[in-house]
Each structure stands twice: as C-alpha cells, then as structure tokens.
A protein has these predicted regions:
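Extended amphipathic alpha-helical heptad-repeat regions
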Residues: 1-238
Length: 238
C-alpha cells in the first residue's frame, strides 16, 4: 500500500461519507418531523378524551339521571284506586330504579376495563420515557469519549509526525467498513420512517374522525336534554 493508493481510497471514502451525511441528516430531520406529528396526535387524542369523558360522558349521565327522575316523578303523580294499581306504581318505580342501577353497573364495568387499559398504556409510556433517558445517557457517554479523544489529540497523542502508510491504511480500511455498515443502517432507518409516517398519518385521520363523531354525539345529547326538560315541564303541569 502506497501513500497515493491511500489518498485514492480516502477520496472514495469521502465521497461516500458526503452521500451518507445527506441520508443520515435527512433521516434526522424526518425523524423529528415524525415525532412532532406524533406529539400533535397525542395532544389531539387527549383533547378527544377530555371531550368524550369529561364532556359527553358527564352530559349523557346527567340525561340518564334526569330520564329516570322524570319517570319516577310521573309514576308518583298517579293516584292508584286499588291495591293492584298501587302495586303497579310501586313495581314500576322499583323497575325504573333497577334499570338505572343495571345500566350504571354495566358502565362501571366499562370504566374499570378502560382504566385498566389506560394503566397499561401509562406503563408503556414509562418504558418509552426510560428509553429516552437511556438514549440521552448514551449521548452523554459518547460526548465524553469524544471529548477525551480531543484532549488526547490536543495533548499530542497520535501526532501527525508519527503517521505511517500502513497505519493510515488501517484507518482508511476501518472507515470503509464503517461506511458500509452505516449505509445499511441509514437505508433501514429510511424504510422504517416511511412505514411509521404512514401509520402516524392513518392515526391522524382516525383521530379527526373521532373528533367529528364526538361533536355529533354532543349535538344528540343536547337535543335529548331538551326533550327531557319538556317532559319534566309536562309532569310538573300534571
């Protein structure tokens, strides 16, 4: 191996490095764009959750209470003329109370089930946070090692005066191997980013559809509330 051959190989490596920089740094930009989309989706999901649970759910539950309150109030306005009619009124009141309790118990089961799923999701988010922390630690460790390398170089270790053709050839060959591995990693990352971006955009569409459905349901809930109020007024008038 000669100095001229080393120079040729260095030039080839440099050309590949320039290509890899474009891909790797492009992937970095796309990865952070993708992360931004994911964060936006998460905020939209939380907004939908609040609108559905704290908003629509509570309004619908208020309607349920008012519906059964109206039914029981109406039954109590009746004037039974005999024991059979009295039993009818009382049994219907009990039935209304039971219908409400059965409905509430079923909802409680769903709340418990959904809460369990949310707890699992939180556990996954904790794992994600740990992964981010670990990646940060790796960056800090890498920076520490590179700072040590800079300090050693500044202190005169691995000086240019000690360079040899064979030692340079080893570094050049190692660089070529790293370039090959890095090219594979960059290509895999590009493919993964494309796949994940597609899924993220699909999620965005689903979230938007859910938002529209939540809005439509609230309109129905409010319409039901008007009917409930009308029924209440009729019962009050007798």
């Amino acid at each position: 191996m000669t100095a001229e051959e080393n120079a040729k190989n260095i030039a080839e490596n440099e050309a590949r490095i320039l290509e890899l920089e474009a891909v790797v740094l492009g992937n970095k930009s796309r990865a952070f764009d993708h992360r931004s989309l994911i964060e936006e989706n998460r905020m939209m999901l939380l907004s939908n959750y609040t609108a559905a649970f704290a908003g629509n759910r509570q309004l619908a539950n208020m309607n349920t209470y008012a519906i059964f309150s109206n039914r029981i109030a109406f039954l109590r306005t009746l004037s039974p003329e005999n024991d059979v009619q009295t039993n009818f009124v009382n049994s219907q009141i009990n039935k209304a109370r039971l219908d409400a309790l059965v409905h509430r118990a079923a909802l409680n089961s769903k709340v418990i089930e959904i809460s369990a799923r949310m707890a699992e999701i939180n556990a996954q988010l904790i794992d994600v946070n740990r992964a981010i922390m670990q990646a940060n630690e790796e960056i800090v460790a890498f920076n520490g090692a590179q700072l040590a390398a800079n300090s050693a170089m500044i202190a005169g270790e691995h000086s240019m005066a000690e360079a040899t053709v064979s030692a340079n050839a080893v570094v050049i060959s190692t660089n070529a191997e790293i370039i090959a591995d890095l090219g594979s990693t960059a290509s895999e990352n590009s493919a993964k980013l494309e796949e994940h971006l597609t899924k993220t955009l699909e999620n965005r569409e689903s979230i938007s559809q859910n938002k529209a459905e939540i809005s439509e349901r609230r309109t129905k809930i409010i319409a039901n509330r008007a009917i409930i109020a009308s029924n209440r007024a009729k019962i009050a008038r007798g």
